[in-house]
């Protein structure tokens, strides 16, 4: 009967997942029903990422003039690997002086403890990156990535097509026990037999190591290849976006030491698989080009996120748009308030109008419904081919008029004009809505397709999020909809640390002393 091996990991410090400050430790239990020749027992702590990308048949036909099967491209990166021998002890191992003679271990139960150092900050695979490596990160901003898609390790057990393509990228961490048995005396079995047992675990770095830094454009060795594509007829999960293709403009491409690097992937909204070959970028022909990039500006120290488009008003001359103003909307932690006053997220929303003030004051403009979506873009890269997956999560959908309040959310009597009188604005007081002001982000620690909600970027996987605020309006009986996109937004699955100022010690008057008469 084969030996029975079990791995018991000590729980992480936060009780949920292992982080940068944890030291992986635990106990290996070995049960033998009969004597066994064992040379050594090792515990291996390792992590790796793997991606699989495809080029569809339409692209292959345009390049070669003939129908060819889709091409698979695979990539494998070792993120870390540490090994610790737990049997035999060091003094015995050193005394063997290189001898391969095994130990005869009697039947029974044996426990071996192990402990590793803290997790490294940078992945081990960086030392294998060459000048021709195409990656999403540079050597400077590469960090050890979090666990991702570790539940979907066998493709043949996935019956959902969207999830099937989504599972093409993985980051897996595990503890592996490896027992090396004694060499067989038979000449046709010259190698040591190995018995292995693995235990996967969830690792998520500290928030500072999860931040997706913008692509760098300097003279250092650039390994970043960023393809924020929206639409691949083969591998795109289009829960929200439509498929289309776009040729990447040559002015947005920089090649450094043979490495393809897209200087800014936010100048185009829809693209297909990108192929880098000999420093040249080749892609499928353009079928449509629709830019949805919103320009932002600063007002009184706050960043302004305008709506994607302006809405025409009934007088035929005036228009209105929505603006979200915030100092800190680019980062959202779990349990952050979204609309509450002082949250610096959606607590300052304004309706900005252009036109004749007399005409505007006569209009009936009422917010009817609100919907807030979290949009996920996950891109996998392998051998210069990038495939994208897209999905949307509805955070809240609410009828704004369901609960009546004493004061309307939008009061046009409070409209004010800017310094030159060309525009007028009025605050949309979503922070006063009794439901919205209590809404917090991801209170239940939701797992989307098996993964917690967090942004990250590593060599071959990039997962970014954006927020979409949709408001339905009633304007003189006509329904219209506004849209504001916050792109990108850094999402954390950790709860924000609130640093409270330490209270000053209470003043205690000093004791009084009297001179004693001599």
Swiss-Prot record:
GO biological process: endocytosis
Disulfide bonds: none
Compartments where located: Cytoplasm
Cross-link entry Glycyl lysine isopeptide (Lys-Gly) (interchain with G-Cter in ubiquitin), positions: 118
Keyword Nucleotide-binding: no
Entry function: May regulate endocytosis by recruiting RSP5 ubiquitin ligase activity to specific plasma membrane proteins in response to extracellular stimuli.
Subunit structure as annotated in this protein's UniProt entry: Interacts with RSP5.
Protein name: Arrestin-related trafficking adapter 10
